[in-house]
Amino acid sequence: MMKAKISLITLGVSDLHRSLKFYRDGLGLPAHGYKEGNEVVFFEMEGSWLGLYPKDKLAEDATVLPEGAGFAGITLAHNTGSKEAVDAVFALAVSAGARVVKKPQDVFWGGYSGYFADPDGHLWEVAWNPFMDLT
């Protein structure tokens, strides 16, 4: 039986340096062992890892075509402990260059969330869920 855990999420990016600047310098995520010239960047998250890898190389590694546009059918989420924390994280992302997709607001399921897109268009939800502690 497979253990229910996601250990690494790798985002295919069009410009590694731009994405590194967004995640490391803008959002403040610590890049693990990154050296100039590396083709991949890893960020240690609490309980998992986030990787950035050139989109064409990631597609080649997975033996699929790199073309494609629009919604990919997946979003990433960062959950916080309060509405105020959602607003603070969202503001940090926007100041780092994120594109606002949906401003944080009260949502139908009783929580509070908003969406932004990173420089490559990957959608991130920043949310507070009063019913489940996902922090």
Residue ranges and their predicted role:
Residues 19-24, 93, 121:
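Conserved active-site tyrosine of GNAT-family acetyltransferases
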Residues 1-8, 30-117, 128-135:
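Vicinal oxygen chelate
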Residues 13-16, 108-109:
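Conserved beta-strand-loop-alpha-helix junction that forms the acyl-donor binding cleft
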Residues 18-19, 85:
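Short phosphate-engaging motifs
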Residues 27:
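Major-groove DNA-recognition helix of helix-turn-helix-type DNA-binding domains
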